[in-house]
Amino acid sequence: MGLKADNWIKKMALEHNMIEPFCEANIGKGIVSYGLSSYGYDIRVGREFKIFTNVNSTVVDPKNFVEENVVDFVGDVCIVPANSFALARTVEYFKMPNDVLAICLGKSTYARCGIIVNVTPFEPGFEGHITIEISNTTPLPAKIYANEGIAQVLFLQGDEPCDVTYADKKGKYQAQTGITLPRILK
C-alpha cells in the first residue's frame, strides 16, 4: 500500500472527479491553508455547523441520537464553546476509487490551539461530503473559520482492489451531502 503524491492526486481529481471542487495550489496566506500539498490534500470546512448543547439535558446516545442535542449554525466563523464539540462538513465532495483508502488528520494550526479534528477513513468506493468532528478541548471558546483548511487527507492505494467497496455494501453514509448525524442501520 503506497502513499500517493501530488501529481497522482491532481490527476485523479481532474480526470476522475475524485475531489470537487479541487484547488491545485496550496492556498495559505492570511488563512488556514487548503488545497494540494506534496503528499495530501488540505480540505476546507463548509459554512454549516451543528454545535452540541446541553440545554435539553439529554444523554448523547449514538444508537438513538436526539437532534435536540445540537444547534444549527451557518456562518463564516463558528464559535465552538469551551470543552464542547461541533460537527461540520467539507466544502469538497469526494468520489473514492475502489483501490484507495484515505486517512484524514487535523491541521497543526488548529491542534496547537486545542482544537482536535476527527474524521473516519474514506473507504474505497465511498462518495459524498465528509462529516467532520471538531472538539474544543480548551476552557475557552474557539473559532473555526469556514471555507478555510481544517484537516489534511492522505491517500493510500492498495496493492489490489478490495472485493467489497463501501458502495457495494451500501454504506449508511454513502452519497451524503451536508452534515450527517449518527446513523444505526436497523
Curated annotation (Swiss-Prot):
<comment type="subunit">
    <text>Homotrimer.</text>
</comment>
<keyword id="KW-0378">Hydrolase</keyword>
<keyword id="KW-0546">Nucleotide metabolism</keyword>
<keyword id="KW-0547">Nucleotide-binding</keyword>
<dbReference type="InterPro" id="IPR036157">
    <property type="entry name" value="dUTPase-like_sf"/>
</dbReference>
<dbReference type="GO" id="GO:0000166">
    <property type="term" value="F:nucleotide binding"/>
</dbReference>
<dbReference type="InterPro" id="IPR011962">
    <property type="entry name" value="dCTP_deaminase"/>
</dbReference>
<dbReference type="GO" id="GO:0015949">
    <property type="term" value="P:nucleobase-containing small molecule interconversion"/>
</dbReference>
<protein>
    <recommendedName>
        <fullName>dCTP deaminase</fullName>
        <ecNumber>3.5.4.13</ecNumber>
    </recommendedName>
</protein>
<feature type="binding site">
    <location>
        <begin position="107"/>
        <end position="112"/>
    </location>
    <ligand>
        <name>dCTP</name>
    </ligand>
</feature>
<comment type="function">
    <text>Catalyzes the deamination of dCTP to dUTP.</text>
</comment>
<dbReference type="GO" id="GO:0008829">
    <property type="term" value="F:dCTP deaminase activity"/>
</dbReference>
<dbReference type="Pfam" id="PF22769">
    <property type="entry name" value="DCD"/>
</dbReference>
<feature type="binding site">
    <location>
        <position position="152"/>
    </location>
    <ligand>
        <name>dCTP</name>
    </ligand>
</feature>
<feature type="binding site">
    <location>
        <position position="166"/>
    </location>
    <ligand>
        <name>dCTP</name>
    </ligand>
</feature>
<feature type="binding site">
    <location>
        <position position="176"/>
    </location>
    <ligand>
        <name>dCTP</name>
    </ligand>
</feature>
<comment type="similarity">
    <text>Belongs to the dCTP deaminase family.</text>
</comment>
<comment type="pathway">
    <text>Pyrimidine metabolism; dUMP biosynthesis; dUMP from dCTP (dUTP route): step 1/2.</text>
</comment>
<dbReference type="GO" id="GO:0006226">
    <property type="term" value="P:dUMP biosynthetic process"/>
</dbReference>
<feature type="active site" description="Proton donor/acceptor">
    <location>
        <position position="133"/>
    </location>
</feature>
<dbReference type="InterPro" id="IPR033704">
    <property type="entry name" value="dUTPase_trimeric"/>
</dbReference>
<dbReference type="GO" id="GO:0006229">
    <property type="term" value="P:dUTP biosynthetic process"/>
</dbReference>
